[in-house]
Amino acid sequence: MTDATSNLDSHGRPLGVLRLSLTARCNLACPYCCPDSRDPEGMLDLQDQLRLIRVACSLGVHTVRLTGGEPLLSDRLEPLLAAIALDRPAGLKELALTTNGVLLSPERALRLKCAGLDRITISLDGADAASVARMAGLQGGTPAGQSLLDQVLVGLEAARSAGFNSSHGALKLNAVIQKGRNDDQLIPLARLARDRGLELRLIEYMDVGSRNGWSLAQVMPAMEMVQCVSSHWPLDPVGRSSNSTTSRWRYRDGAGYIGVISSISAPFCGDCNRIRVTADGQVFTCLFASQGVDLRPYLRTDESETQLRECLSELWTRRSDRFSEERSLQIDKEKSHAEMAYLGG
């Protein structure tokens, strides 16, 4: 077996996080994500997923985050959690989920908690009906936005009631902020999160994929977001932990924390420890990559898992990605990227 400590990429970064997409489909149509309406062919089955997680953990992965599309649309979610719980890899410290929360009923939240899920992050890009409708790509206008907002808030409370403790970081709120579209929602979202004891993470609008018409002019820099929030509720810096995507700030009045993810204005490529595997088994070593490597031949023909382990290990040790840093140097400006919903964020 490969020694997990020997798996450093060409920049000395260890492998630590596997983001595993369960589906490319989504029940929303957020314009910055542009999800697909159907899944790709050749989806990984349960045994493929389990083998992948087991081998990834043997190479140093300590956190598995289940993503989409919208993972709650996948009929693979609960069976996967149940199977992991039966034989959880020794190195797997955290099993997390990112969702829009629409399908997170009280019953389902409890099932997920009982099945061994450790953390849930819910995405919400507005705090009023019109903004929610606009950012989710809804056709029904304000009434549809209000219905969606109500569902997400129910999902948040369902997760809390199921035992996902926000004060311990087990329940967080994500928001993508796009200048000119929902930057007016910064303070309302911060207020919503503060009132509910949630840590809000504000994400810069990213140039992932080619469908969303990304422009640098639409990016609100993280520090500008921080200054905006701090003008209402003073903040003190906490910093960014090694390998984390989030720089955190503490509310001076004791109302918790807020975070920013600044992949455009202040890239954190230097200690990125993530790989992403799509629902059809393509592995990507960078969110901004244009092409992945198909793992299915290794997953389905090698019961010993040796070839899969060697493939992942070689892929990681040869890894040299630092796209966000290169973006600032105007390198590879015309390079195409895989789509956000396909990669799983």
UniProtKB/Swiss-Prot annotation:
PROSITE patterns: RADICAL_SAM. This is GTP 3',8-cyclase. It comes from the Bacteria. S-adenosyl-L-methionine binds at Y32, G69, S123, M206. Pathway: Cofactor biosynthesis; molybdopterin biosynthesis. Keywords: 4Fe-4S, GTP-binding, Iron, Iron-sulfur, Lyase, Metal-binding, Molybdenum cofactor biosynthesis, Nucleotide-binding, S-adenosyl-L-methionine. CDD domains: Radical_SAM, Twitch_MoaA. GTP binds at R19, R65, T98, K172, R274, I275, R276. Its EC number is 4.1.99.22. GO terms for molecular function: 4 iron, 4 sulfur cluster binding; cyclic pyranopterin monophosphate synthase activity; GTP 3',8'-cyclase activity; GTP binding; metal ion binding; S-adenosyl-L-methionine binding. [4Fe-4S] cluster 2 binds at C269, C272, C286. InterPro entries: Aldolase_TIM (IPR013785), MoaA (IPR013483), MoaA_twitch (IPR010505), MoCo_biosynth_MoaA/MoaC (IPR050105), rSAM (IPR007197). It comes from Synechococcus sp. (strain CC9902).
